[in-house]
Amino acid sequence: MSNPSAPPPYEDHNPLYPGSPPPGGYGQPSVLPGGYPAYPAYPQPGYGHPAGYPQPVPPVHPMPMNYGHDYNEEERAGSDSFRPGEWDDRKVRHSFIQKVYCIISVQLLITVAIIAIFTFVEPVGKYVRNNVAVYYVSYAVFLVTYLTLACCQGPRRRFPWDIILLTIFTLALGFVTGTISSMYENKAVIIAMIITAVVSISVTIFCFQTKVDFTSCTGLFCVLGIVLMVTGIVTSIVLIFKYIYWLHMVYAALGAICFTLFLAYDTQLVLGNRKHTISPEDYITGALQIYTDIVYIFTFVLQLVGSRD
């Protein structure tokens, strides 16, 4: 278009929509026409964002969650987004753990008090040693309440029967343990208490930290329980006729090891995030199992380190 008065050529019939770009493409204008504010050109591949404008906010990715090793990829993909229910479940589990260990603390305080009275108060210790009926009646009450709480869902979930049965169970097992402790020297009882406390705390810390899932080995623990029960029956029959020291010590060591493993298993059932867990409604069951494990560890350790009066 060299002559302004001449009509535009055929190629310029629509000057707003040019037909074909010139060879080499269009270059970006260095300066926009006067009168209009400068506006940054669109970013080209390989070029950064124009200076003076904030960069766009990057997409927000969900925070990675800490999954257990049992989660598969499909479950992980379906759980990547934040769900408010996860925090609720976590709060429920934490509240459940606190409730279980508060109950266990009260049970252990009652048991330690009974053991101290039976051991350090000589008239009481002498009375329970001379009256074995106290031991057998307490043991019968212990078995009945234990089986009721462990096997019957109704009583252990119904207030106030759960508290009443658990209190009777704790007192009965405390009387049994106190009677056994009264037959040993005071020093042996104190040493057994210290060892039991160290073992119980160590197992609990280990269960909080480890990735080993003891709850996936239910069959193994059933076998251990059967072996311990059969060994106890055979040992009791043999010791009735003749006391064999090494046989007694082997049985006590086996019992201490087995109930330490049972404590780890039951602790992981309470902590959750494993293959098998206890329902938050069964806090009585959790306290019952862990408390029983600790008491049995104490009795077996007492047999190992103690000497009878």
Curated annotation (Swiss-Prot):
Q: What happens when the gene is disrupted?
A: Mice (older than 14 months) are prone to aortic dilation as well as cystic medial degeneration (CMD).
Q: Which InterPro entries match?
A: Bax_inhibitor_1-related
- TM region(s), chain numbering: 101-121, 132-152, 163-183, 188-208, 221-241, 244-264, 286-306
Q: What does this protein do?
A: Negatively regulates aortic matrix metalloproteinase-9 (MMP9) production and may play a protective role in vascular remodeling.
The protein in question is named Protein lifeguard 3
Question: CDD domains given for it?
Answer: LFG_like (cd10428)
Question: What is the organism field in this record?
Answer: Mus musculus (Mouse)
Give expression by tissue.
Expressed in most tissues except spleen, thymus and testis.
Q: Which residues carry this modification: Phosphoserine?
A: 79, 81
Membrane topology listed for this record: Multi-pass membrane protein
* PANTHER family in UniProt: BAX INHIBITOR-RELATED (PTHR23291), PROTEIN LIFEGUARD 3 (PTHR23291:SF35)
Q: Which UniProt keywords apply?
A: Endosome, Lysosome, Membrane, Phosphoprotein, Transmembrane, Transmembrane helix
Tell me if Phosphoprotein is a UniProt keyword of this record.
yes
Give any GO molecular function from the UniProt entry. death receptor binding
GO CC annotation terms, alphabetical = endosome membrane; Golgi apparatus; lysosomal membrane
Q: Name one GO biological process term.
A: negative regulation of catalytic activity
Enumerate composition-biased segments (Basic and acidic residues). Answer: 70-84
Question: Which intervals of the chain are annotated as region Disordered?
Answer: 1-31, 64-84
